[in-house]
Each structure stands twice: as C-alpha cells, then as structure tokens.
C-alpha cells in the first residue's frame, strides 16, 4: 500500500515537472515571437522552439512577409536534429501556400515527434487545418499551453483576419487642466523625456501612425522614429495625415521628401487636384476616400484601406478632434495615455 502511494506521488511529481517544462519552453517561444513585433505584417508574430533530449536544438521567430516563418527558421537551425524533436510553437502552423509553403508540411517532412501549439490560428486559410494535417501524419498535437499570452501578443493579427482592419491604439497626453495636447510635435510636448521615448518605441513597432490636419498645422511634426537606444533597428512607420479638404501645405515636414519613411494624404474629393498632384510629385501617396455624414474622411473606410495595404497596427497620435472622431465611431481598440 505504501509503495502504491509512493508511486502515485512520484508520478504526480513527474507530471508536474513535465507540465512546468512544457510551459517554460512555450514561454521561451513567446519571448522569441515578440522579437518580431512590428516586422511581420500581414503575418502574425510567431516563435518556435525544437527540443530534443532536454536540449534546444533549434529556435526562430517569424521573418518579415515573404521570409521564412518561425518553424522554418527553427528547423533550419536544428538540421538533422529536428528528427524526433518536440516542437513548441506559439501559433498553429500554417497549412496553406502563400508567399511560403505550409509549415505543417515542413514539420512532417522533418520527422518531428510531437507538437505543442499554444493556440489555433483563426485565419480562415488555417483555422485548425494545420493541426489536422499534423495529426493525420501521426504527429500528436497538444494545444492550450500559454494560450492567453499567445492570444494577447497577436490581438492585431486576430482582429485583422476577422475584420480586415488594423488594431487601433490611441496615444495622447493630458495637461494638468485636463485638456488633450498633441504629443508628437517639437514645440508642444507636455510630457517628459521618458514618455516621449515611449512614444518613439511605440512608433518603432507599429505599421502606421495617424494624425489629423489640425495637429500638423499646429505643430508641423516630422512624425519619425527617434530612439536613444537600439538605433540599428529603427523603423519609420507609414505616416497618414487625415485632411479632408487639403488644408496642410505641401511644405509641411511630414510631406518633405527628405523626411525618412513614407507619407499618405487621406482625403476626400474636396481636396483640389492641383494640391494632390503637388504632393504626389513629392512622393506622397493620395488615398481619396468617401466622406462621412459630416463631410470628413470616413474613418471606417480609412481602416479598410489600411487593412488592404496589409498593415496590422495603427497608432493614432492626433489631438482631441481626430481622437474624438475615432471614439465616436467606435473604432478604438486600445488607449495609452
């Protein structure tokens, strides 16, 4: 009897130990995934780890669109050691042909032993097909480890594949009198240096930033990314100026050809053709969009357009008018004050 009880305790300890090990490997894979933040659109951030005999033999995270996915990077690093390994991946392996081949097929061909997948991919092209293909090949698939964390890091992708629109985050500063002030101009900052650097870090991992015409007229910002650290990995997101009637001068910094990155004028038929033509000659793209009931750019149509361009994330940095419009239309997903 005592031996039987001892065996149960020992088995329990083994189960707890293995569960903890699975969680730790998945957490490591999640850490890899976030290294790709802001660099994978329209694909999700994914991390993958291959483990064999208690050692990590391969790891990777998703490359920019068109490049290898996390699983392929990990398989390449593992080489022959991939055979018989256990895979920990933060999102269901894809099962369709896009710019690259199906990751599920690559895992099968490599001879992996089993797969731990944090969460199913809601993309209609995948949506359980990757897991099914692995199981059909005789590879056990376990899901649910670190599921909440995996869903959290890919909220923008999950929204995108369902709605076709980007994840919208608002960033604004509030003065002591409770008023919203723009926080991207050179002369109108009301926040400290630490907060300003935070904004630049947010820009560095977002696909597009958006301001209204009023902000540009008041502050004439560059809307570029300026980091004090990690300067080798700076990215300037697409700059979108919402200007329904074309009030902002082509001489504005945001439109200047020497300003790093690309700019877009989101406007309506109210803007003069000559104004748009001048901006186009400076390399600015023109998005002529429908008007809303107030004669302004229809923001829902604008989000559709951003999604069509394959962008998953949008940072709204405008003042009270543009922020209020997004809130009124129910288009805000997240707010950072």
Label for each model-derived stretch:
Residues 114-115, 208, 313, 334:
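Residues at the N-termini of beta-strands
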Residues 1-17:
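N-terminal amphipathic/basic-hydrophobic helices that include classical n-h-c signal peptides
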Residues 159, 167-176, 180-312, 321-324:
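Active-site ligand-binding patch in enzyme domains
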Residues 326-334:
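Short acidic amphipathic segments
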Residues 50-149, 238, 264, 268-271, ...:
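Zn2+-dependent cytidine deaminase-like catalytic core
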